[in-house]
């Protein structure tokens, strides 16, 4: 008699944009990765260990604790070559630059045309609100 062993399925690797939110102050950190689940787990591990490279994010994590943080994927299946443009759109949408209400230190480098294309794509898919109206 032959037994078939089911191998555990590997999680699907998803590219996209993610958001880390401090629920205590509604500040956001936006990032992108060609493997968002792995990247979010890395952020969570670094914050737990007190070794995250974003000092403001680490400070608030230490102050409020893990229960006040949400780790979420916001846009999925973004082509690798377009990740930076979509990340920039998300930073814009969530006002996550430090001088506003967020943890991102800088805007990702991308040209304005790519930003507009990414913004329009998300708008057409109904994934973001139209800020023009």
Can you name each region flagged by the protein language model?
Residues 2-132:
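Structure-specific nucleic-acid interaction/processing domains
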């Amino acid at each position: 008699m032959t037994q078939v062993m089911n191998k555990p399925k590997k999680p699907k690797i998803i590219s996209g944009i993610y958001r880390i939110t401090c629920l205590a102050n509604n500040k956001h950190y936006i990032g992108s990765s060609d493997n968002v689940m792995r990247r979010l787990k890395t952020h969570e591990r670094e914050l737990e260990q007190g070794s995250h490279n974003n000092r403001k994010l680490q400070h608030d994590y230490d102050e409020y604790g893990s229960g006040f943080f949400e780790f979420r994927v916001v846009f999925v299946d973004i082509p690798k070559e377009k990740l930076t443009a979509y990340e920039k759109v998300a930073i814009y949408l969530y006002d996550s630059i430090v001088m506003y209400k967020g943890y991102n230190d800088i805007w990702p480098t991308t040209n304005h045309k790519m930003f507009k294309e990414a913004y329009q794509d998300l708008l057409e898919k109904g994934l973001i609100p139209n800020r023009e109206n």
